[in-house]
From Swiss-Prot:
This is Hydrogenase expression/formation protein HupD. NCBIfam families: hupD, hydrog_prot. Keywords: Aspartyl protease, Hydrolase, Metal-binding, Nickel, Protease. Not known. Could be involved in the processing of hydrogenase. GO terms for biological process: protein processing.
Length: 192
């Protein structure tokens, strides 16, 4: 298992709805990150799905946070953008960046109001192409950004002194973030 400082609690979080095409980018990215890499004990990998304010407790426990999400930056579809710390909107009056009904900035704001927001925030967002395809897969330009987004997360973790290691064997089904029937390979890549 990789090593890192145990007093530096890190949360790697993917948020989104896998049932709405590109809205599922964050969940699919964190799922693939978990499939590819082993992390030290002070790093938690979480599929936050569409849990909204239920995620506040997880943020309160973290010193540092990396979030994968589909973000409407107004860029060309499939474009990645990384924002850090104060660039990540914390207050509900900020322009909504998240595509979820409860914006993630409300979650950050709630943790901040409780005085327990992570000290360092990194948001890795991908500009969606299609949010209207109920039950549809990620579109190609968004799907193609999963690997580069994971590379960005690994770079951030390295900046924070965290060593991750590539898994040598596939995860057992019981260790996956998502049940086998809704993971990326079995759900989105199934024959039409």
């Amino acid at each position: 298992m990789p090593t890192s400082s145990q007093d530096n609690r890190i949360l790697v979080l993917g948020i989104g709805n896998i049932l709405w095409a590109d809205e599922g980018f964050g969940v699919r990215a964190v799922e693939e990150f978990h499939r590819r890499y082993a992390v030290p004990d002070n790093v938690t990998i979480l599929d936050g799905g569409t849990q909204g304010l239920y995620l506040v407790n997880y943020l309160e426990e973290a010193d540092r946070l990396i979030v994968f999400d589909a973000i409407d930056y107004g860029l060309e579809p499939g474009r990645l953008k990384l924002v850090r710390d104060d660039e990540v909107p914390r207050f509900t009056g900020a322009k909504k960046m998240s595509l979820h009904q409860t914006g993630f900035q409300e979650v950050i704001s709630a943790a901040d109001l409780l005085g327990r927001c992570p000290k360092h925030l990194v948001l890795i967002g991908c500009q969606p192409l299609d949010l209207e395809d109920w039950g549809g897969p990620l579109t190609p330009p968004v799907r193609d950004q999963i690997a580069p987004s994971i590379d960005l997360a690994c770079q951030v973790l390295a900046e924070w002194g965290v060593t991750v290691s590539r898994r040598s064997a596939p995860l057992a089904e019981s260790e996956r973030l998502l049940a086998n029937d809704i993971d990326h390979a079995n759900y989105e890549m199934r024959p039409a």
